[in-house]
């Protein structure tokens, strides 16, 4: 393992959830204690997720139900990042959404104008309420020059027993195949996710540590932003995937329970 100094010096931990802290409704052993360890050792934490099917408020409710401490300032989603991006770059432009009602509420809370006709922007998310009409309309707007923005590039969302759900990246692949338009992805691995949080908290990127189970999102965003990275082997990545990947984490640990032990000053096992 690499020297632990940079890990121990990290002041803010950006935490993936699915595959890192829990899978479905199954909380990984030691995951809640890990959050308490961060707080007890004076470290900040933010639950950082690419899952745009839920609003930030939904995550607060879900995390608390699963036993995790969580306040509003502890959650940042790709949906929230997308809303900020739209307001910064396309303020007032009419948007057609391929997304859940929760994502719709999130965008509306940021003042994003959502329309069914005359859209200049198509926004896609992880739409667990997807119907064919949404795809039809999105392709219609894209083929007529609408800008394509997507919340996250994940192909699938992991589920218990090795199952997966088609995620935003898969939906976007369909839309791109039909329209010929490639999306701009806002969530991880876009460094914007880390940069926005750094600006809001005052913690420099080099003292931020991204923790997750996916190389192409959780670890890649850290690499792109110049942050520290911890890959946990509790989710999607196995040894073969890690060895074959061009994206490499600074630290590889079994799970967040092992990370908690290190942060408490113990010896990694």
Describe these PLM feature segments.
Residues 46-48:
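Domain-scale selection of a single, long terminal region
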Residues 1-15, 22-43, 54-76, 83-269:
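Asp-based, Mg2+/Mn2+-dependent phosphohydrolase catalytic module
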Residues 51:
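Conserved phosphate/oxyanion-binding catalytic-loop motifs
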């Amino acid at each position: 393992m690499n020297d632990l100094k940079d890990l121990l010096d990290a002041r803010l931990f950006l935490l993936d959830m699915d595959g890192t802290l829990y899978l479905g409704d199954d909380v990984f052993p030691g995951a809640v204690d890990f959050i308490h360890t961060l707080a007890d050792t004076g470290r900040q934490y933010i639950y950082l997720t690419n899952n745009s099917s839920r609003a930030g408020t939904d995550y607060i409710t879900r995390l608390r139900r699963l036993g995790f401490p969580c306040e509003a300032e502890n959650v940042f989603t790709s949906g929230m990042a997308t809303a900020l991006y739209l307001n910064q770059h396309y303020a007032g432009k009419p948007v057609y959404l391929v997304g859940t009602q929760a994502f719709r509420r999130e965008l509306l809370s940021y003042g994003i104008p959502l329309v069914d006709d005359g859209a200049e922007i198509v926004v896609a998310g992880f739409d667990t309420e997807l119907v064919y009409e949404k795809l039809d309309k999105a392709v219609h707007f894209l083929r007529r020059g609408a800008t394509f923005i997507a919340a996250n590039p994940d192909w699938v969302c992991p589920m218990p027993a090795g199952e997966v759900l088609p995620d935003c990246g898969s939906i976007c692949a369909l839309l791109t195949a039909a329209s010929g338009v490639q999306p701009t992805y806002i969530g991880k691995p876009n460094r914007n996710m880390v940069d926005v949080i750094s600006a809001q908290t005052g913690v420099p990127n080099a003292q931020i540590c991204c923790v997750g189970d996916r190389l192409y999102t959780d670890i890649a965003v850290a690499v792109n932003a110049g942050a520290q990275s911890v890959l946990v082997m509790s989710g999607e990545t196995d040894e073969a995937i890690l060895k074959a990947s061009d994206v490499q984490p600074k630290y590889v640990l079994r799970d967040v329970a092992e990370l908690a032990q290190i942060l408490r000053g113990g010896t990694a096992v």
